[in-house]
Structure formats: C-alpha cells, structure tokens
C-alpha cells in the first residue's frame, strides 16, 4: 500500500515554527532531584499529617490540604528547616500565587538553586512581576554555571530554556548557533534523565533550518520518542511517511502515528484522518475525526499541558480534522450526509487555522483531495 503524496498541509517539517509566538518557560517543569522533595511528599513524611487525613476524610479537599501544608511548612520554617522555605514558595507557585512565590524565592535565591531557577522562569514569563527576559536569562545562567552539586539536576532544563531564549532573541542577542549548542548540552546524547524537550526541539530545529539536516532530525526525534515525547513520535511518523532522514516506510509511519494519536497527539490524529480519507477508508476517517472534531480553541492550552505537544501543532491537527470531517459530512462518506454540519466544521477549520484551511480548500478545487 502506498503512502499518500505530500501536500502543502504538511508544513511541520518544512516551516520554522519557533519564530512566531514567544514560548513560555513554565512549559518546562521543574526537574526532580533527590536532594529535594515535593510539598506532598514532604507532608506525607509527617505522621501528624497522615493521621489528620485518616481521621478527617471530609477535610481531604484541595483547599484544606493547601492550608494544612502551609501551616506545616510554617512550623518547619520556625525550626530552621531550610528546605521548607523553598517548598512554601513552590506551593505558592503551583497555586498561581505568583507574587507570594516571587517574594519567597527572592528571599532564598542565594542559598537555593531551585529558587534561582524558578525566579528565572518567573521573570522571563512575567509571573508575579513585569516581564524581564534579561533578568530571567541571568538567573538561568547562574544555574547553568553553578559548580554546586545541588544544581546539577537543573542544568539540562536551564540550558534548554536558555537555548529557547537565544533562538527567539529574548533577553539576549539572537543566535541559532548558541541555541543549538545549549540544546545539545541539554539533550545529553539522548540521556532520558536529561531534557527530553531539548531532544525533541533539536529534531524540529534540524528539520527546519537551512540547509536541513534530516538525518540529525530523525536521530533526535528517535531519541526523544524513545524517552516518551509524543511530539517527536508524531514527527517520526511523518518522516517515515515521506522518507525524510530515513528510508520511506509506511508501516513504520502508521505505527508511530497511531501510537502518538492513541496517547493524545492531536496533530498525529489529524495526519491519520487525512491518510484514511485519501486511502478511501472513510469509516475509519470518520471514527478518528469524531474524536476531536468538537475540540475548541480554548482546549489547546489544556491539551498542550497534558501531552507536552506544541500548541501550533495541536491547532493544525484540529483544523485538519475539522476540514476532513466536514468533507465526509458534505459527501456522506462514512457518515450520514449533513450539509449544515459540514458547513459548521468547514467554518471551524477556517477559524482555527485560516492558512491551512485555505490550502486544503485549494487542493480540493484542484481535485487533489
């Protein structure tokens, strides 16, 4: 069975997606470290807290847990527990109380590398303070350059974030070369304990830079995919489909795309919907498109947070699905014909991604769909 011929809708490997909307460093979660524990782990170590949960299950609500954790941390701070200072700031941060978190982190930044890292995130993203990319970059550099063993687990995440800053020219002079160097450091030869996002972004970088280096792109997407990155798993599917950086292999492509789609990669779902439509597997096409055709723009941030996929690719996937779902409804392919619903989903595709919808419509006019 032949794979579909490439269309203009597949720009993910041919268009630089990082020069548009400014990325947020909060998308890179604070790395875990054996030197530290989370607020919940810290609280659970105390028998008093455990017993309270057991005896009063009616109080086991989020608000009550937060209040209890803050009281417990306050007690530990009084005893001189240095870790409790950071955990209180982190709890503020996770609850969205950014001004309180900023104040707490600034108080302990000279003694706590995780607080320094979080200050870098907050100043860069403008959380609890005015956006100050330069200051955010300075804090990240402090983490990256620190010789202290307690900063070691933060270095890959800091390097990844600094790479993004250099790539986007935010807080520093734009430099793709420096971004690449930092991402390679952060990716650490595919180490699963390093920054998997750096591994994935290298795959995207090498497939969009000029000249393209598709073999490198395939390598890094493979590393990231092996470490659980859904974005790269979908990208590998496309690379196998079109023989980019690897020999064309439709079976491997479909395997990657189905796995990625099953775990929530919306763009992979969109590619599969298009594939099933072109191969005239209309029942399958509709079965897949039904799953996400009713997603809305406001769902994108939540999906991005859950799947760790880039919002722009989620947007494209949703637009593709809406377009092909509309086409099936318009013609009664694999579903009862309904022109009113078809019009709704065509409009939705245009609203989600006007450029992509226009290109798909152009292909339709030229009878390539």
For each of these PLM feature ranges, what is it?
Residues 79-82, 110-116, 125-127, 132, ...:
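Short helix-capping/linker turns of helical repeat alpha-solenoids
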């Amino acid at each position: 069975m032949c794979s579909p011929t490439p269309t203009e809708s597949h720009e993910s490997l041919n268009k630089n997606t990082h020069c548009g909307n400014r990325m947020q460093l909060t998308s890179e979660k604070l790395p875990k470290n054996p030197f530290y524990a989370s607020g919940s782990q810290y609280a659970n170590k105390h028998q008093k807290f455990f017993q309270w949960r057991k005896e009063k299950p009616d109080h086991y609500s989020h608000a009550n847990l937060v209040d209890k954790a803050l009281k417990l941390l306050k007690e530990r701070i009084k005893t001189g527990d240095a870790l409790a200072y950071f955990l209180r700031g982190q709890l503020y941060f996770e609850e969205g109380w950014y001004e309180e978190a900023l104040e707490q982190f600034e108080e302990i930044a000279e003694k706590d590398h995780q607080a320094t890292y979080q200050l870098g995130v907050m100043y860069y993203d403008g959380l609890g303070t005015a956006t100050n990319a330069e200051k955010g970059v300075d804090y990240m550099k402090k983490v990256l350059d620190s010789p202290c063993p307690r900063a070691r687990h933060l270095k890959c995440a800091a390097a990844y974030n600094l790479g993004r800053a250099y790539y986007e020219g935010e807080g520093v002079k734009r430099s793709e070369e420096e971004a690449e160097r930092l991402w390679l450091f952060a990716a650490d030869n595919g180490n699963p304990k390093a920054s998997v996002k750096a591994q994935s972004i290298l795959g995207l970088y090498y497939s969009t830079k000029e000249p393209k280096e598709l073999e490198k792109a395939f390598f890094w997407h493979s590393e990231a995919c092996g470490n659980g990155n859904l974005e790269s798993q979908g990208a590998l599917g496309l690379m196998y489909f079109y023989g980019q950086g690897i020999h064309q292999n439709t079976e491997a492509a479909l395997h990657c795309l189905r796995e990625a789609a099953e775990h929530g990669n919306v763009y992979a779902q969109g590619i599969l919907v298009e594939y099933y439509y072109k191969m005239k597997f209309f029942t399958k096409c509709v079965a897949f498109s039904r799953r996400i055709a009713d997603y809305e723009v406001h769902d994108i941030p939540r999906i991005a947070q859950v799947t760790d996929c880039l919002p722009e690719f989620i947007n494209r996937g949703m637009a593709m699905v809406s377009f092909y779902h509309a086409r099936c409804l318009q013609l009664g392919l694999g579903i009862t014909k309904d022109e009113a619903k078809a019009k709704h989903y065509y409009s939705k595709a245009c609203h989600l991604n006007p450029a992509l919808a226009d290109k798909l419509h152009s292909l339709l006019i030229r009878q390539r769909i």
